[in-house]
């Protein structure tokens, strides 16, 4: 026989569980879904069996480094062929074969975003885009910055399969004549079609956070913790959280690299260590279980 207190606790848990079920469709990434499955067995079953939750698959750090072709195929299969959006950020172990397997099983994909997936090649991307273009189906978004080896010929061929040139995030840089991503500039004086700072990241120094150009004597830049010689404009550097040791911030795209410091005082501000300072201290990165 349950006591009144036990019944109240059970009712409260049911209410919490109902709220969590409502929240599930709004979760951003696979990391968040995998975190939620640990709450309860019923929630785990709901996530595993609800096809609608898997029509958008987002895999980014810290899970990216462990993603293989087989794991990608396993998770994409949970959409039962209804996958619409595939976002893989810096998934170095994903190959052309793995991506093609997902595309063949999900012919309704409209967005492929694979920045930094260096295990892919231009030929593999083109085969996937060509496969998806059958039956008058066209990709709405194709982001492939960081996939090495694209040429003008590859770009011209891709345009024939895409709904518009704006679909793809690569173009020919007017400075170096190479196929690279050319970000827009938010600086007021550069807000024109033939702006002087129009060029790729290698030709024009830019803020890693807002992409504003950092050319001219009136601009000031600060070093970021991201590595790769990334810099930030002074405005972004001032507002971004900084490593408690070296006082360098991460840009938003690399914020997952922060190693948060547990705090016991509720009045204390959250703090973190950048990767360089964290590993210098001899600690180990945390791991996330892929199992559902």
From Swiss-Prot:
Q: Residue ranges of the F-box domain? A: 21-79
Q: Does the keyword NAD belong to this entry?
A: no
Query: A Pfam family name for this chain?
Result: F-box-like
Question: What InterPro entries would the database entry show?
Answer: F-box_dom, F-box_LRR-repeat, LRR_dom_sf
Q: Can you cite a GO biological process for this protein?
A: protein ubiquitination
Q: To which pathway does this protein belong? A: Protein modification; protein ubiquitination
* Alphabetical keyword list: Developmental protein, Ubl conjugation pathway
**What top-level branch of life does the organism fall under?**
Eukaryota
Please list which residues make up the signal peptide: none
What function does the entry list?
Component of SCF(ASK-cullin-F-box) E3 ubiquitin ligase complexes, which may mediate the ubiquitination and subsequent proteasomal degradation of target proteins. Required during the endosperm development in embryos.
Q: State whether it acts alone or in a complex, and with which partners, per the record.
A: Part of a SCF (ASK-cullin-F-box) protein ligase complex. Interacts with SKP1A/ASK1 and CUL1.
UniProt free text on domains = The F-box is necessary for the interaction with ASK proteins.
Name of the featured protein: F-box protein SKIP28
Q: Which organism is it from?
A: Arabidopsis thaliana (Mouse-ear cress)
Identify the taxonomic lineage of the organism of origin.
Answer: Eukaryota, Viridiplantae, Streptophyta, Embryophyta, Tracheophyta
């Amino acid at each position: 026989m349950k006591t009144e207190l036990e019944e109240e606790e059970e009712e409260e848990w049911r209410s919490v569980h109902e709220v969590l079920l409502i929240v599930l469709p709004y979760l951003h990434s696979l990391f968040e879904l995998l975190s939620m499955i640990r709450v309860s067995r019923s929630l785990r079953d709901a996530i595993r069996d609800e096809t609608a939750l898997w029509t958008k698959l987002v895999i980014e750090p810290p899970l990216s480094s462990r993603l293989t072709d087989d794991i990608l195929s396993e998770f994409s299969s949970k959409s039962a062929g209804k996958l619409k959006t595939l976002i893989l950020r810096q998934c170095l172990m994903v190959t052309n074969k793995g991506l093609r397997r997902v595309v063949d099983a999900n012919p309704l994909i409209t967005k492929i975003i694979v920045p930094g997936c260096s295990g892919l090649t231009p030929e593999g991307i083109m085969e996937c885009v060509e496969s998806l273009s059958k039956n008058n189906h066209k990709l709405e978004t194709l982001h492939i910055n960081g996939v090495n080896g694209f040429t003008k010929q590859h770009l011209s061929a891709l345009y024939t399969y895409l709904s518009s040139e704006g679909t793809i995030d690569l173009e020919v840089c007017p400075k170096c004549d190479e196929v690279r991503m050319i970000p827009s500039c938010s600086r007021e004086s550069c807000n024109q079609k033939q702006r002087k700072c129009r060029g790729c990241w290698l030709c024009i120094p830019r803020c890693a956070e807002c992409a504003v150009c950092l050319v001219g004597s009136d601009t000031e830049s600060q070093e970021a913790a991201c590595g790769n010689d990334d810099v930030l404009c002074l405005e972004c550097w001032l507002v971004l959280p900084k490593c408690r040791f070296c006082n360098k911030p991460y840009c938003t795209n690399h914020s997952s690299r922060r190693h948060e410091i547990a705090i016991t005082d509720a009045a204390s501000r959250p703090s973190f260590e950048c990767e360089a300072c964290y590993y210098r201290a001899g600690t180990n990165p945390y791991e996330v279980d892929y199992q559902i």
